[in-house]
Regions:
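Contiguous transmembrane helix-bundle modules in multi-pass membrane proteins
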Residues: 1-162, 167, 249-271
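Accessory, solvent-exposed terminal regions and/or long lumenal/extracellular loops of proteins
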Residues: 134-270
């Protein structure tokens, strides 16, 4: 019941953030946008206890059990989660106020759920959903902390160094389509071990005259490499933006796990 109340609150916040700007524009003709700070301030403080109750809730009989009956293994896992989270947050210089509690409780849920998979009489649909949710929060946190970005103006033949990589702007291929012209840039991302080729596009449409950019993304199990380039006024120069976004694929996997848990739960009720 507690988890359901939290979920209703989170969904209400998202609904308000989506619908409120539309209503305001209709009523007052005033345009506003609701960004991440709104969601951070409302959701994160409630997300921390939500993760905690997801971890311990399935193992506690709320009416019969007392706090003293909380499993000692849970306390040990909680301490391990604190230590790992503190080391990580301290190493990467992340804000302690909200990041540390989020890391602690998402790790706690992650470890508890893995342990419970090997227990007796487990609710498999519930565990899959809880594991997926903990993986989702951890992946988002790690993505936010470890993501890297570099932007610079480059010409064909230029190369720049970013972290341990070299970004090489090799050439541009111009192709004429039916109603637009496309500029395909060829970039090589070189590091010590391998080379990655990315080919983002700039599309110049005829009527009306519009310029759009199409990013090229290379996905691996650990990170996505994202590159996009745009035309700027300086002759021969293009603005090139390269991003490394860790654990993006795990965000999608976690969403699939949450959905799978929900489907299994519905099938179980219908049996």
């Amino acid at each position: 019941l507690i988890n359901n109340l939290f979920m209703m609150f989170f969904l209400s916040v998202v609904l308000i953030g989506t619908v409120y700007p539309i209503f305001l524009e209709v009523i007052n003709n005033e345009k506003i946008s609701i960004g991440p700070p709104f969601y951070h301030k409302l959701i994160i403080p409630f997300l921390i206890p939500f993760l905690f109750f997801m971890a311990i809730g399935p193992n506690i009989k709320w009416i019969k059990d007392k706090m003293g009956k909380i499993n000692l293994k849970d306390i040990f896992i909680f301490i391990i989660s604190i230590v790992i989270s503190y080391i990580f947050v301290n190493k990467f210089g992340v804000s302690y106020l909200l990041s540390l509690p989020l890391f602690i409780f998402s790790l706690f849920l992650f470890f508890v759920t893995i342990r419970d998979f090997f227990g007796k009489n487990i609710n498999i649909s519930q565990k899959i959903s809880h594991f997926g949710f903990s993986l989702l929060i951890l992946s988002i946190l790690l993505n936010g902390v470890l993501a890297k970005e570099h932007s610079s103006n480059m010409r064909v033949g230029d190369e720049i160094k970013f972290l341990d990589k070299i970004i090489q702007f090799q050439n541009i291929e111009v192709i004429k389509k039916q109603n637009y012209q496309t500029l395909i840039g060829k970039f090589n991302i070189v590091d010590k071990n391998n080379s990655l080729s990315l080919k983002p596009e700039i599309r110049i449409y005829d009527q009306p005259e519009t310029i759009t950019s199409e990013a090229d993304i290379s996905s691996t199990i650990f990170a996505d490499n994202f590159l996009v380039f745009n035309i700027i006024k300086n002759d021969g120069f293009y603005n090139v933006r390269y991003q490394i976004k860790p654990f993006m694929i795990w965000i999608w996997i976690s969403v699939l796990l949450i959905s799978l848990g929900g489907i299994l739960s519905l099938k179980k009720k219908n049996v």
